[in-house]
Amino acid sequence: MFWADAAVKDLIGEQRISTGISPSGPIHVGNMREILTGDILYKAVIKRGLKSDFIYLCDDMDPLRKVYPFLDQSYSKYVGFPLKNIPSPDGVGVYSDHFLNPFIEVMRKTGIPARVIKTSDLYGNGILADAIDTVMERRSEIKDILEKITGRMIEGDFYPYEPLCEKCGRINSTSVISYKYPYAEYTCKCGHHGFADIRRAEGKMPWRIEWPAKWYALKVSIEPFGKDHGAPGGSYDTGKRIAREIFGIEPPLPLVYERIMLKGKGAMHSSTGLAIPASEIIDVMPPELLRFLIARVNPSRHIDFDPGLGLLNLFDEFERYLNKYREGDIDGDSKAIIEYSLIEKEKLSYPIDFRHLITLIQIYQKKEDILRAAMASTKDQLDESALYDEIKYAKNWLERYAPDNVKFKLLAIDEKAELSDQDRAILSKFLEVSNSMAWDSNEIHSTVHNVAKDLGIGPDAAFSTFYKVFIGKERGPRLGYFLFNLGKDFTIARIKSVLGGNS
């Protein structure tokens, strides 16, 4: 059974799935695993016939913890400020929205219907006030839970609330000295003494307490989260104890997921600068392919993401799944993977093979010429709008992530390759049979193989000869498609020119 269907198979009644993030930096491809895992679980619950709601929490009350690599050093004065109270790096609006808003657009494009809720609104509208009052009154019990599970002693008076200093603006430099509903009395390292109203966005709970408080206030029943939270002694271990013993609720059904690794570099973290923003990757791959990247791998396994050649391989794999799905020759898990990947069920194919399109856009410059060549290479009716979208993805990928061995440029007529006797023999033999061959990609491919066989040489050597003549490299795109799209007249004329120039 597919992992999401297995996770929800025993659930009854209405469900609320929650995911979230602290918008401290660019929300990246690695973060997509959480929200897409949540979305797939949400859709699995709906498929079971249960009512469901899906929320995405933006923790904009979290403080800026340091000056990250992508920030100017002038942001040092904002360390400790809530993210919602810091100017945006681009000078427009606030810091948290600067990173959240592009991600909301990614959510829309990838078919994620989650309601976005800002934590500052939960505090500001008093939604968490009851939970705060409860944890403040029962702080000694919470202290015991934290110490037993984490193995770390908490020194001095413990109040599970962090007031926002009304003087210096920091939320990480205050200490509560007394509490009487609804006010937490505090002092700040800046020297200020004041009172914070727990019914307003005048402070926040520490993460280990805030998380179960959200479960309680929002009635969360399912939540995926990363393995760091799910580790022994981690925040889920403390959260479920607080949920049961302090709030009297069952903790959400957990689904722990592994990280997405940037191939050859490690886990993605916006705080280290090792990350690809989700808003950027959605420009180089269709949203369905991003969903497929997540859906096809059980959350318990990490994902190696390679935006270079690996993206082409991922596209190939996706097309294989789609073909089997269309033909009805597919197992249950693979069928589920495709159905949870698709945004529109009618979109069961892409206009043209992505690798082939990468070749076309390097041969032709104008979209109209690419469209004409694409139409000539398939018997299927092409959706022009969908093809133009795919052209956009292909061009962006070629510009940003394509390895050098995929890129090529046609040699000009005066850039003639130096040919060996073997090269000349291969090209001459190809010319001999070219008049009688059908000019399609499969026939061209077979002909080059047969030429190599007739001359007693390996096919790789024959292919290299053609790449040398047309792009000045030893390797290149799939030769049959490549020569087909160059056209028979152009191909034959170029070969004759090169042979004549080296005679």
Swiss-Prot record:
Motif ('KMSKS' region): 267-271
One Pfam family recorded for the sequence: Anticodon_2
Keyword Cytoplasm listed: yes
Listed EC numbers: 6.1.1.6
GO terms under biological process: lysyl-tRNA aminoacylation
Catalytic reaction equation(s): tRNA(Lys) + L-lysine + ATP = L-lysyl-tRNA(Lys) + AMP + diphosphate
Gene3D superfamilies cross-referenced by the UniProt entry: 1.10.10.350, 1.10.10.770, HUPs, Lysine tRNA ligase, stem contact fold domain
Protein's UniProt keywords contain Aminoacyl-tRNA synthetase: yes
Positions of short motif 'HIGH' region: 23-31
GO molecular function, one term: tRNA binding
Record-linked InterPro entries: aa-tRNA-synth_I_cd-bd, aa-tRNA-synth_I_codon-bd_sub2, aa-tRNA-synth_I_CS, aa_tRNA-synth_I_cd-bd_sf, Lys-tRNA-ligase, Lys-tRNA-ligase_SC_fold, Rossmann-like_a/b/a_fold
Protein name, entry field: Lysine--tRNA ligase
Organism: Thermoplasma volcanium (strain ATCC 51530 / DSM 4299 / JCM 9571 / NBRC 15438 / GSS1)
